[in-house]
Amino acid sequence: MGKIIGIDLGTTNSCVAIMDGTKARVLENSEGDRTTPSIIAYTQDGETLVGQPAKRQAVTNPQNTLFAIKRLIGRRFQDEEAQRDKDIMPYKIIAADNGDAWLEVKGQKIAPPQISAEVLKKMKKTAEDYLGEPVTEAVITVPAYFNDAQRQATKDAGRIAGLEVKRIINEPTAAALAYGLDKEVGNRTIAVYDLGGGTFDISIIEIDEVDGEKTFEVLATNGDTHLGGEDFDSRLINYLVEEFKKDQGMDLRTDPLAMQRLKEAAEKAKIELSSAQQTDVNLPYITADGSGPKHMNIKVTRAKLESLVEDLVNRSIEPLKVALQDAGLSVSDIQDVILVGGQTRMPMVQKKVADFFGKEPRKDVNPDEAVAIGAAVQGGVLSGEVKDVLLLDVTPLSLGIETMGGVMTPLITKNTTIPTKHSQVFSTAEDNQSAVTIHVLQGERKRAQDNKSLGQFNLDGIQPAPRGMAQIEVTFDIDADGILHVSAKDKNTGREQKITIKASSGLNEEEIQKMVRDAEANAEADRKFEELVQTRNQADHLIHGTRKQLEEAGDKLPAEDKTAIEDAVKALEAALKSEDKAEIEAKTQALVQVSGKLLEMAQQQAAAGGDAGDTSAKKEDDVVDAEFEEVKDKK
C-alpha cells in the first residue's frame, strides 16, 4: 500500500507532509520551500503556474492570477461573501449556470475546485518527487466550520487532481493531532485557535491517554469561514489607498497593476509589524498622470495597523465563548491554547487570545505546518502506520429538514460526534398527499430560509391517507468526512428514496469526470513541454561546446570539416526556434556526427596534456591518500 499523504490546502499557503516512520515530515517543494503559495496563474502563452512562480508574476498579470480561491469553494454567486470578494478581487468572479461562484479567465469559465486542484497537483508532485513513487491517496484538511457543500467541493478538487481523498479532516483537529502525538500530554483539554489566510476556527478538544492509546475527542467547534489574513491585508490596503488619494489626489483602485503591487507591499508590511514597531511602504513609480510619475512612501506604525483591524480580532472572540459554552466548560478548564495559521503571529492576536483564556498560548507548535503534520498523522492512522490513535470529530453545524410553516427541524445537532446516524418520523401536512419533498438544511436558524440549503428530493407513491396518518421516516447519516447521506422511507409501503447530499449547486459527476480528463491531458502537455525544454537545453549545451572546440582547434581542422560543422550548428540553431522536439533531436544528432573529427582532436590534446602532467607530478612521500565512502541521501 502506498503512502497516504497529508495536505493542508490553505487560503494563502498550502503544505504537504508524510509519515516517515513514527514522525511526520513536512516536504519541501521544487523551489525548496516548506509551504507553497495557493496561487495559480494562467500566462499569455498558455502555461499554468502554481505557487511562487505564479506569485512572482502577479504584478504584471493581475486579472489572470488567482488567489484566495478557498473563500469561494462551495459557495453560491449570490452569497454575501462571494459578492464582497467580487468587488475587491482583481480577477473576475461570475455566476455559473447552476448559480455557483465560478471564475472567468481569458474568456474561459473555471470552477473553484478546478483551481484548487492545481495546488493539490503540486502537493502531490512534491510528495512523489520525495518518495520516488506515485501517490494516489491523501487526507485533506478543511476549516472546521466548512459546510457540506464546501467539504464536497474540496473532495471534488482532490479527484480532479488525481487523488483519492481518504478522509477530509478539520484543521484544528489536525493541529491537535500534531501537538498531542509526540508529547507526553496525559489527559488534557486544549483550545485550538486557528486564524489562517481566509478562515477562522476554534475547537475545544479533549486528549485522553489510556494504556498508551490516545483519544482526540472534539467537544465543540465554532468559527467564521470568511475571516482571515486576507481581510487584515484589505484593511491596510484600503488605508494606503486613501492616504495616497489624500496626498496625490489619485485613486489607485482604477489601476489593477498598482493594486497588485500594493497588495504585496501591504502583506509584507503587516508581517514586518509583527516584529517591528513601524515600517515604510515605499513604492516608487506606483502610477503616473500628466505631470509625471507618482511615488508612494507611507509610514505605518504597529498601533495604526492594530486600530485598522481591531474589530476583526474582536470578531474572533465571540466564537470562543460559544465553543466553550457548547462544550460545557469554562476558561479555567482549558489547560493549553494552541495557535495555528500565519495570522496568529500578530502580537495583538496573541494578546487578545491570552487575555481571553488567562494564559499564554503555546509557542512550540509551528502555525504554518501543524495542520499538514496532523493530516499526515491521520493518513498514517488510516494506512495502519500509526497505531494507538483514535480521532473523534464533530459536525460543526446542525442538520435538519424543512417542516410545515417553513421551520427548520434539526435531526442532528451541531457538535455531534461523527460518524453518526439519526432517524425521525414525520407525517404528511395534507389529506391524501401522495408525495413529499424533503428539503435538507444546515445551520442554526429557526426559519428554514435563513439556513444553508443543501439540496432536496421527492418521495412519491405514498398511500393516500388523512393528514398526519402517513409515517415518513427520514434518516440522516454523516460519514467520517462530515458528508451527509439522507434517506426517506414510507413505513406503510416500504418505499424508499436515498441521496448523498450534493449541494443544490456543486459539480455533477459528468463535470468532475471532464475536469479529471482535462487535468490528465494537461499533465501530458506539461510532460511534453518539460521534454522539449530538456532537448533544447542539451542542444544549447552542444552548440556552446562545439563553438569553443572550433576556436581551440583553429587552423588544425581542415576547412571542409569546419564548414560542415558550422552549417550543422546553424541548422540546429534554426531548429531551436521551433516547437518541434523531433526536429531538434535530429539536428542535434547531425551535429554530433559531423563534429566527430573535432572531438577526436580534443581527446588527443587532452591526452597529450595529461602525459605532460604525469611527468611533472611525482607523488610526495609524506602525502597520504584520503579514503572516502560515498553516502547517499536516504529518500
Swiss-Prot record:
Residues 602-635 are annotated as: Disordered. Keywords: ATP-binding, Chaperone, Nucleotide-binding, Phosphoprotein, Stress response. The keyword Chaperone applies. Transmembrane segments: none annotated. The modification Phosphothreonine is found at T199. Induction: By stress conditions e.g. heat shock. One of its GO terms (molecular function) is unfolded protein binding. The keyword ATP-binding applies. It holds the Pfam family HSP70. Acts as a chaperone. Belongs to the heat shock protein 70 family. This is Chaperone protein DnaK. It comes from Yersinia enterocolitica serotype O:8 / biotype 1B (strain NCTC 13174 / 8081). The gene is dnaK.
